[in-house]
Amino acid sequence: LQKRVWITWETQRRSIELSRKFGCEFFIIEHKGVMRYPISVFETLSILKKTKPDILFVQNPSMILAALACICKYILKYILLVDRHTTFLLDKDYKNIPWVLFFQFLSRLTIRHADITIVTNSLLADMVKRLKGNPFILPDIIPTFVETERVELKGRRNILMVSSFGIDEPVQEVLIAMKDFSQDEVCLYVTGNYNKLDERVRSTAPSNVVFTGFLDEQDYINMLFSCDAIMVLTTASACMLCGCYEAVSARKPLITSDKDVLREYFTDAVFVDNTAPGISASIKKILDNIDNYRERIESLKGKLITQWEEQYKQLEKRLSDVNS
């Protein structure tokens, strides 16, 4: 049996789930502060020396981890798969910004020297091909959640907005859209650390918006099951949103941004242009047809689970071909 190892420098559900599926020995190396990189490099080298993998999976980010794995591959002679989560600034032309140019250099290096670069969508796969890499599309596994209790929510209809208050999230437009609804009619619950949101923007939220703050895992899962629909938005063009997979898992009608990569995968969602009028209209649309959208998402869940298993089998075959 071949020895499989998965190393990541940050905790993400995707790496945990995929490492389990691929039968890998799993290592999380997480450090903060100025010594983060030298300590992480040392621990990674120690793991590689101890485990002597035949097949190594690494998560990118971290770019440094992926680059290190590419270098060590030629010494330790393992097959390398890099699970790449973002474009890492390769989709834009940045000039005269030294740290960006350095990261772009590492990005190209890791794409060309990895045996397989795993990506979540066709847009990223095309980018990897253009840079002479070997891509394979494998979205996230639809997670399995267990509800432990129903959360009492205050609206007649309740929407959960899955948020991290990132710069790619049109939170202000959502707050404006919610002014079209009364508190009795529709209530919006927004997850995530709201301290990241500008206080001036937060103060404009109407009374039918509740900021939950960061929720622990089980409380978050219970919220997924307790709401009527889930909203997950981004302005980014190549981002597959974790909250979309979670909405499908909980069989909840989904409102998400009108991006090609999201349309391609989450076919039965309601897609929105990230404007306040568009968001308001999408909420009305989904709540006026809630049973229909619930059935469509339930059907989509079964389809995506079957589709993912087929993609997984194809990747195992690709891995076998590389190995031979």
Where on the chain are the PLM-derived regions?
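Conserved donor-binding/catalytic core segment of Leloir-type glycosyltransferases
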Residues: 149-169, 175-179, 189
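Membrane-proximal helix-turn-helix segments that form the acceptor-binding/catalytic region
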Residues: 42-45, 71-75, 88, 98-117, ...
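Acidic donor-binding loop of glycosyltransferase active sites
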Residues: 225-239
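Nucleotide-activated donor-binding/catalytic signature segment of Leloir-type glycosyltransferases, i.e.
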Residues: 198-218
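Donor nucleotide-sugar binding/catalytic pocket of nucleotide-sugar-dependent glycosyltransferases
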Residues: 108-148
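Short hydrophobic beta-strand element within catalytic cores of glycosyltransferases
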Residues: 229, 252-256
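Conserved acidic donor-binding segment of nucleotide-sugar-dependent glycosyltransferases
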Residues: 269-277, 284-291
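A charged, aromatic-enriched C-terminal amphipathic alpha-helix characteristic of glycosyltransferases
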Residues: 291-323
